């Protein structure tokens, strides 16, 4: 569940809300057949885990009738920085319009996104931005909607978005949008913890991006790898071989688990000790199999700040 951090504001109008929303990975990702009634999307059974790499979305109230605006900042914007990028297709903007329609508000809001989550990386950066926008507007517009209602809006936008509203651990079914929150002390999470899927981790990130439809199309052709908990890993590695090298290097250096995150190409390496973390980082640097290394922890959850 998200955390709200705010000063005492009484009945004053809220003018700006910032949300730090974490990335996600899939500790397991089992892919079933595609369904025409889902627009060709595949049936999924997955364990989501929120990872402590955060995008920050700030939603600021604008004058009535002035419309929306979008500003992106960050050192690793990828294709989002392209002059040809259509801001109306940005996930946060889509979330703004979906919330405006659902709540009968005008979308007179300035959105600023400070991106730290790798773009096109299988870590739901766009979904995190949409979820952050939904959480911010729930506070900015004083809706006070329960998380279940927010998830209904999020589910119309994409599979990962309902999970990104809460973070932590969850099981996703359907095409990923049906969320069952998992207790940190429950049997499923306890089993994953015993297998090394928790705690400190390293993210191996890349300048290259993978498009999710391309990865699924490749999966449809070649299927899943034997024993892969992520059924998309074989397809992602076939399209981006450096991810496979990063997995091998991490496991050889002492990672408890290493795998492609979602549809890739980012690689997650859980490291049980500080020595293992140092060894994996050195292995990745020496082999140049990743472009950027991010050290963090899991699980993580969104944080809402009332800023003005």
Curated annotation (Swiss-Prot):
Active-site residues from the entry: 24, 160
A biological process term (GO) from this entry: terpenoid biosynthetic process
SUPFAM superfamilies: GHMP Kinase, C-terminal domain, Ribosomal protein S5 domain 2-like
Pfam families from the UniProt entry: GHMP_kinases_C, GHMP_kinases_N
InterPro entries linked: GHMP_kinase_C_dom, GHMP_kinase_C_sf, GHMP_kinase_N_dom, IspE, Ribosomal_Su5_D2-typ_SF, Ribsml_uS5_D2-typ_fold_subgr
Superkingdom, taxonomy of origin: Bacteria
Pathway: Isoprenoid biosynthesis; isopentenyl diphosphate biosynthesis via DXP pathway; isopentenyl diphosphate from 1-deoxy-D-xylulose 5-phosphate: step 3/6
Residue ranges crossing the lipid bilayer per the database entry: none
Binding positions (ATP): 118-128
One Gene Ontology term of the molecular function aspect: ATP binding
Catalytic activity of the protein: 4-CDP-2-C-methyl-D-erythritol + ATP = 4-CDP-2-C-methyl-D-erythritol 2-phosphate + ADP + H(+)
Coiled-coil residues: none
UniProt KW Ligase keyword: no
Keywords on record: ATP-binding, Isoprene biosynthesis, Kinase, Nucleotide-binding, Transferase
Keyword Ribonucleoprotein: no
Family: Belongs to the GHMP kinase family. IspE subfamily.
Name of this protein: 4-diphosphocytidyl-2-C-methyl-D-erythritol kinase
Lineage: Bacteria, Bacillati, Actinomycetota, Actinomycetes, Bifidobacteriales
Gene: ispE
